[in-house]
Structure formats: structure tokens, C-alpha cells
Amino acid sequence: ISRVGLYALPVNPPQLNSLADLGKVPVITHQGSAASEYLKGIGGTVEQASRESLGWAMLQRGRAPLWATSPVVLRSVVASGESPPVEVLPILTLMEDMACNPQMDPEVLDSLRNALKELYEQGDVHALYRQYGVELD
């Protein structure tokens, strides 16, 4: 399970109570992400970044006041000593799965899904999230 929120620099972040308050405020998203597609689908203004680290750089440089990302991504791109962005509004909770070519052999896909399920069941995914300071519960 992954949570995506709208993040802003800690100095004077926009005050949002819901996505209806977003209006045409531009939001930086990772190109092709669920957040990007969701925000575009509700009429949001999206600035797409080709890499997560570019999203952080765009936010720092004022390209847009908000960045749609997850806590795991934040911890991976914000350098030690930098002031991390603050969450303004949570927007999506996603159940994670794998993206695979539609023509992939169904047996191979089932094997990969079973391996992913096993990683969750054995606690490996939780351990990885904890390593980056994120709790799934």
C-alpha cells in the first residue's frame, strides 16, 4: 500500500482542505504516475517530471508550489540536512502491484505476483518501508 500526498516547501505552504481547493494551482508529478493521471482527470494543472529527483528540484526552484509524491520518495531524494517538504493534503492510497507487458506469459506473471505476495507476507516489504521511515499500518 502506498500513500501519495501533495507536498510543499515548509515556508508558507498553500492551505488546502480538499482537492476542490486546488483549482488551477500547478502540481509537479512523476510522468505517467497514478497521481498525474488522477489529477489530470479531475482537471488539475500538472507539471510532469521524468524523474522523482527532478520533481524535488522543480519544487525547490519554485516551478510549482506543490509536488505529488509519496513519503518513500521524499526520503530517497531529500538530502540529509535539507528541510523536507511538508504534506499539505493526502490525495491517493494505492494498492501496489506490478506493471507488466500485456503479452507476458500468464504463468510468468503469476509467478512474479506470488513472489511479491510472499515478500509482503514475510515482512520484507514492511522492513524496506521502515528502512525509509514509512509505516504501512
Task: Identify the residue ranges that each predicted region occupies.
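Extended ligand-binding regions for polar small-molecule ligands
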Residues: P10-P13, V25-P26, S33, M98-L136
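Short helices/loops that flank or line small-molecule/ion binding pockets
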Residues: D21, G41-I42, E52-V72, S80-G81
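Aromatic-rich, solvent-exposed beta-strand/loop patch
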Residues: G32-K40
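Beta->alpha turn/N-cap motifs
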Residues: L9-P10, H30-S33, E52, A68-V77
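Short beta-strand-to-loop elements that line the ligand-binding cleft
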Residues: T29, G44-E52, M58, E87-V88
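Solvent-exposed, polar/charged alpha-helical surfaces in well-ordered, non-transmembrane soluble domains
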Residues: A20, E37, S53, A57, ...
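Acidic, polar ligand-binding/catalytic clefts
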Residues: I1-D21, G32, P85-I91
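Periplasmic-binding protein-like
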Residues: I1-G5, R75, A79-K117, L136-D137
